[in-house]
Amino acid sequence: MSIFSVVDMDENKVSAVYPLVRTAFPDVSPQQWLDYARMARMRGGLLGLRGPQGTLYGFLTYRIEESLRLGRIFAVDHLLTFELNRAAPGRQALCEAAEALARNRGCKAIELRQGSRGYAVDASAKARGWLNLGHRLEAVVFAKMLVGGVEVDDTTPVLSAAEG
């Protein structure tokens, strides 16, 4: 059983997430975060990860979208946890909550967007084509099919538009 609980972060709670945001994205101002969080809640939602004492250890933002290849998806734009355990029980708790919510909303897949650092290389031939057009490799997108989802060729990674 996890020591963490996952909670919906309503408009009265989103400002509590800002210290986590600031740690990961130091250039984001408090007002930028509040504006983004308000928009994220209108388009989907924001979940918080709380420890046993109520301390916030992470969050994720999500939206429900339609994908040509995957159908109805639960798109996670930001998932951030601060934990010392390599087993990442906080991340696991957030992912389990996201999956339950996705199933509840009738989604066939979850797309998880993460920064590209450590996952993708700018030097690939496909990436260079986009880089030469002024784009940068910003993120990769991982996809998890939910039971009853559509078939996808798992040999081709699902990456951001910058990958091509």
Q: Where does each model-flagged region fall?
A:
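A short helix-loop-beta-strand connector motif used in the catalytic cores of GNAT acetyltransferases and
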Residues: 38-48
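Conserved beta-strand-loop-alpha-helix junction that forms the acyl-donor binding cleft
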Residues: 111-126
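Conserved acetyl-CoA-binding loop-helix of GNAT-fold acetyltransferases
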Residues: 81, 86-100
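Conserved beta-strand in the GNAT
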Residues: 48, 55-64, 75
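Conserved catalytic-core motifs of GNAT/GCN5-like acyltransferases
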Residues: 113-114, 132-149
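Short amphipathic alpha-helix that is part of the acyltransferase structural core
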Residues: 1-30, 156-161
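Conserved acetyl-CoA binding element of GNAT-fold acetyltransferases
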Residues: 71-83, 140
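A short, aromatic/hydrophobic, helix- or strand-capping loop or linear motif
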Residues: 28-38
